[in-house]
Amino acid sequence: MKTEVFTDNISGAAEIIKNGGLVAVPTETVYGLAANGLDAEAVEKIYEVKGRPGYKPLSLMVPGAAVMERYCLSVPPQAKTLSARFWPGPLTIVLKARPEIPPVVLAGGDTVGLRCPDHPKTLALLAATGLPFAAPSANPSGEKSPKSADEVLAYFDGKIEGVIDGGLCGIGRESTLLSMAETPYRILRRGALGEEEIADALVDGMTIIGLTGPSGSGKTTALRARCRSLAPFRSTATRSITNCLKATAS
């Protein structure tokens, strides 16, 4: 097999994905090994090429938050808050998966991770195919994650159909994996996005309801305010959520 390197024209890479092949794609974190995430046979190839254990699930790359309901049974407001703040970017949000997601992606579980990568070429590829990508890091299981197309080729030249050369990855570290499938939320994998940043965004998204005036006086009114305008509460809430996330982090 010849591994084709794509630079500016990604139409060939889009055809490979549509036809069930594998293409390594650039992101802001590390290169990913992408396949059509709705094609079970294509996803199986990822496991085979990487030597990835079958019990480890895969996340899906998506073009943005607008498609979250397409692949997840329920998307809580907090997940929408985080996707609005950090997508495209290095945050993978784990939610309950819809039955349309192939079992091989879920590795026997009932949740799926979604992430929108911050790289123009991969976003263009997602748009060109109209498909979600199952895309773990483009390295053999246990090896260092690649930060360039050359590093991908050193691993998989002749073993995958294509690689998109998007230059050197800016972050060079995997995305943070956050489970929001149930409460309390849990950090499943520490990554490029810190717990403090996640907590700060969650607090920003809160609406606090308080009461002004003594109870029963006839002067009681409802007060609603975003946490960002309530500095003392904001600081305490951010610290509390940060500590909770750190306590769950793997």
Question: Model features per residue range: what roles?
Answer:
Residues L223-R224:
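Post-Walker A alpha-helix
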